[in-house]
Amino acid sequence: MEKKESLDSSLKEIVSVCKRRGFVYPGSEIYGGLSNTFDYGPYGVELLQNLKQLWWKYFVHLREDIVGLDSSILLNPKVWEASGHVSNFNDPLIDCKNCKTRIRADKFLEDQKGEGFATGLTLEKMNQVIKESNFACPNCGQRGTFTEARDFNLMFKTSHGASAEDSLDIYLRPETAQGIFLNFKNVVSTTRRKIPFGIAQIGKSFRNEIMARQFVFRTREFEQMEMEFFCEPGTQKEWFSHWVNYCMNWLTEQVGIKKENLRVREHEKEELSFYSEGTSDIEFKYNFGWGELWGIASRTDYDLNQHQKFSGEDLKYQDQVQNKKYVPFVVEPALGVNRLFLAVVTDAYEEEKLPDGETRTVLRFSPKIAPVKAAVFPLMKKDGLPEKSREIFADLSKLGNIEYDDGGAIGKRYRRQDEIGTPFCITVDYDTLKDNTVTVRERDSMSQERIAVNQLKNWLFERL
């Protein structure tokens, strides 16, 4: 119990700094909110954009074998029948008959029995364990009040059409992948890409989660960075290994996440998705424990075969070199943007005890992803210091998001930027007016040095 309370407490600290410093706000807050919805504030948006741009750079722009796509959120409902989501995209649901609380049965059992306990359990076995154990409802505390577990489809249903008579029941997409599969033939035709190659996209997905929780880790509306890599059957294992390593290296070398906070976990056969022959998760050590950050799945030729069957379209690839046609196999690295956001904030967050006995909160983001690259401070709001500061600020703004801050004592301004994760703070003082140098303070070490204004832009550029 003590450990769980400690984990809950540390997550609350993350939530607090995100709200206090404008990273994440509760959704619809002035109307009392809407559970499990969040709005990303000024610094949260900057962090998200930096993460997405960094992903796009390394998964599209720096690779000749990958192109981009932006497919529709709303798709013909037959797509989801073909993909198997209508019949298979379910989680086990139980209700408390006393307080009407709805609970995801497998996660509830793992909370009670330990991580991994529910892996591979059938609904019948879950019902047996719940009945024999006589668990208490986590909401009202009553025992023996749970309904039998049943499948609950996670897709959001809506209507497409102007009137009830001609409206069509459709779904908000639960993953971005299907839009890529539908456009496989278009991309091959228009870009003349040869296998092996990938199609990547960033976009919103929606899942009606039974137990949406743990801040932005599990939400009903979320953003994905997915890539479907098409390869010749028989080569998928080699590519699978390549993408697991490539993704892990990107997280550590580019995003800057500590290696000790990451691990690779291979799925047991019983927990594989209905479309996968093998999946490995890159997990991050969140405040609440290890959780999936990035899933790399070998989807075989399942999706293209299904869409071929249901649509009647020939989705085989014509291999000109080998003079044969085949349905490509697919390896999919699928990353949740919101989970990555929470991972980098958690990884960067530190309450540091200073030599003078004070404590400072600091977010040690890599400069590549920091929402603010540098902040410019005039020491005083007079004697030409603001004018000189504005001049420096305007010049540095070409490097990225630079902030101008003239409010309060310098020490308080440093602390504010530490909580935002700003790598460098630049103070314009009276010596600046004499020798055209500024004080640059580095976030992590808090060390300071004087830099000539005419060298400042290049000095920063080399470190961002």
Curated annotation (Swiss-Prot):
Gene3D superfamilies: Anticodon-binding domain, Bira Bifunctional Protein, Domain 2. GO terms for cellular component: cytoplasm. Its EC number is 6.1.1.14. InterPro entries: aa-tRNA-synt_IIb, aa-tRNA-synth_II, aa-tRNA-synth_II/BPL/LPL, Anticodon-bd, Anticodon-bd_dom_sf, Gly-tRNA_synthase/POLG2, Gly_tRNA_ligase_bac, GlyRS-like_core. It is an enzyme of class 6 (ligase). One of its GO terms (biological process) is glycyl-tRNA aminoacylation. ATP binds at residues 207-209, 217-222, 292-293, 336-339. Keywords: Aminoacyl-tRNA synthetase, ATP-binding, Cytoplasm, Ligase, Nucleotide-binding, Protein biosynthesis. It comes from the Bacteria. It catalyses: tRNA(Gly) + glycine + ATP = glycyl-tRNA(Gly) + AMP + diphosphate. NCBIfam families: glyS_dimeric, PRK04173.1. HAMAP family: Gly_tRNA_synth_B (MF_00253_B). Belongs to the class-II aminoacyl-tRNA synthetase family. This is Glycine--tRNA ligase.
